[in-house]
Amino acid sequence: PMRGNIPIPEIPHGEDIWLIVAVTSIRSRRTQQGVLYCEAIGRNSTGTIALKIWGEVLDTQGELQAGLWGITGKLETFQDRSQFVVSEYRPITIEKYREHQTTDPVLPRAFTFDIETLTLPDFRERVGPQLERLLRLGNMRLEQQQRYLDDIAAEEERCYSLGSLSATSGRVLSIAVHVGPIPGLEFVGMEQPETEHVFGIDADGFEQGERRALFDFLELMKNFDLESDELVGHNIIGFDLPFIFQRCLVHGIQVRPFVNLSEFHVRGVFDTMHRWWLGAKRNVSLDDIAWALGIESSKTSEVEGSKVFDLYQAGKLDVIREYNLNDVRVTRKVYERIVASFGR
């Protein structure tokens, strides 16, 4: 008899096996010869496995959609990559899944996040000498220097404020995260909880420190599954993710980046800025996209990104915390709209 319900890490190669899994991330592909097939991800309480379904199987079995399925096939290796080649599949109920797995399926999650940053206080000591070299003040007579003092002071303040945009001169103040279902991957009979988190500023508006914020964020992300979960944000490939990992380096925190930012199409990441441009590397603000889509902005007359430093100086950390969360809520709405129109 065919073996089945084997823990995913223990599936042998080349043997017919049946499994019960939650299927996600289905994508149509073609070989170099033009042969149609689908790639998908199967997931249950024992692990995650890459699935491959050839066109002739799709023709006889019908469309494979995200959901709970009983599948039959063999584990094979293609170009040094193991895939479970599916020969048959049929939909199952959540009750049937629970009967074989004893627990509910681990559903794909979208982690939508945003960071707020501040310039390091010590950076001010570096700005002055850098400006002196840039403006060649040493070559000016004293009366010339006096003439430009106001301009120099304004430029020094501007350069200092921009320090928050680099991990060499800035730090993380807070990280806000929304965890919820991936749009279009809702499962019948199951409700996926949605949660919000803020690291770095607690619910009472007290600062917790950058090191703790980084640790707490990494703790939340420790079970992030690159094959089925998604990390969502606006310009996170170009800013937020590198900034977080670089600040971990500064603090000596051991971290294996859970996404590969060097990839042309970064797996496991949904960057709303890139998706707005259909993958092109161009800039657009989250606020501009939200306005175009009729989504209420997170910015107010009191708070926006450029005012975070002043709010911090005024001790209004609770306002910064709520602004950080609102940015995430807006990003989540933009994400849902893009997926609804463009798909995955």
Residues covered by each model-derived region:
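OB-fold nucleic-acid-binding modules
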Residues: 1-27, 91-97
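Metal-dependent phosphoesterase core characteristic of DEDDh/y 3'-5' exonuclease domains
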Residues: 170-207, 224-322, 326-344
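Conserved non-catalytic scaffold segment of RNase H-like nuclease domains
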Residues: 103-246
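OB-fold/S1-family single-stranded nucleic acid-binding modules
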Residues: 74-100
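Short nucleic-acid-contacting surface segments enriched for D/E, G, S/T with interspersed K/R
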Residues: 55-72
